[in-house]
Amino acid sequence: MNIYDQLQAVEDRYEELGELLSDPDVVSDTKRFMELSREEANTRETVTAYREYKQVIQNISDAEEMIKDASGDAELEEMAKEELKESKAAKEEYEEKLKILLLPKDPNDDKNIILEIRGAAGGDEAALFAGDLLTMYQKYAETQGWRFEVMESSVNGVGGIKEVVAMVSGQSVYSKLKYESGAHRVQRVPVTESQGRVHTSTATVLVMPEVEEVEYEIDQKDLRVDIYHASGAGGQNVNKVATAVRMVHIPTGIKVEMQEERTQQKNRDKAMKIIRARVADHFAQIAQDEQDAERKSTVGTGDRSERIRTYNFPQNRVTDHRIGLTLQKLDTILSGKMDEVIDALVMYDQTQKLEALNK
């Protein structure tokens, strides 16, 4: 099947989806309706571009016909030639765009995410850097019009982040932030360093797609739920009613503790949202580990401990080791202006996949 047959098949399926989503039987089936809605949303951009491409092809044909029929009208012929030139340039652009749009899509790209950041090697300095990363992602989310909600956080004595869990919601969140999972290294002079020596510390980032209950169901008998009293700074009990929730997925040992909310039910709901994402991610990672060939065509190895980026403060430099990108814009990037880095990662990933398809 050539690219044009593929595009026509996508358009035909898109029109079929529109009809299915109006079917009362589909509307009443929540799971199927969500699946079909997601499929329609995932193909909309491709169909729109394909329809625009077909219009460009028509414009080329019309311009060529106009040149033939100009009958010595120099002004009309010149106008038609200009239209032909512009349309041919647009045709090439659309063909490249459509090749990328036809690449196999990550089914999670349109999903919200659970973002986890932890201070790793480097003690207090690592925790402080984890806080810097949290601020960077919060500010980037603002630029994208996303909602950023801290669900659980643990702060150390110097105000750094031991661990933070956040929900980021909005359009195409996972597609842009999925490349952030891995070890982020910082090189700078800590505020406590009297000799002015540069120290190296690390924080880890984990990005997981949000998983809806209808997509991944956890058997309640696989969960152990403990209820306890929330505690504040210094460990004092801050609530007379037991509202904090500890949830353990017994088969995997994955554990979530939640005490941010004032009610047990809200803490339970948030804990469930996180544990569902972690368990689904756990099994997805196992499946991905078994597909070495596919992993080679993506950015990085997929290893969660892989060092993906270095932030060098003395040189105001950010280096993404996976794609060899170096930018002297550390202050800009940490202020939330991450587009240049993320766009480069997306483009690299798409290029690798196109090359793999053409082999």
From Swiss-Prot:
This is Peptide chain release factor 1. NCBIfam families: prfA, PRK00591.1. The modification N5-methylglutamine is found at residue 236. GO terms for cellular component: cytoplasm. Peptide chain release factor 1 directs the termination of translation in response to the peptide chain termination codons UAG and UAA. SUPFAM superfamilies: Release factor (SSF75620). It comes from Streptococcus agalactiae serotype Ia (strain ATCC 27591 / A909 / CDC SS700). It is found in: Cytoplasm. HAMAP family: Rel_fac_1. GO terms for molecular function: translation release factor activity, codon specific. Belongs to the prokaryotic/mitochondrial release factor family. The gene is prfA. Keywords: Cytoplasm, Methylation, Protein biosynthesis. Gene3D superfamilies: 3.30.160.20, 3.30.70.1660, 6.10.140.1950. Transmembrane segments: none annotated. Methylated by PrmC. Methylation increases the termination efficiency of RF1.
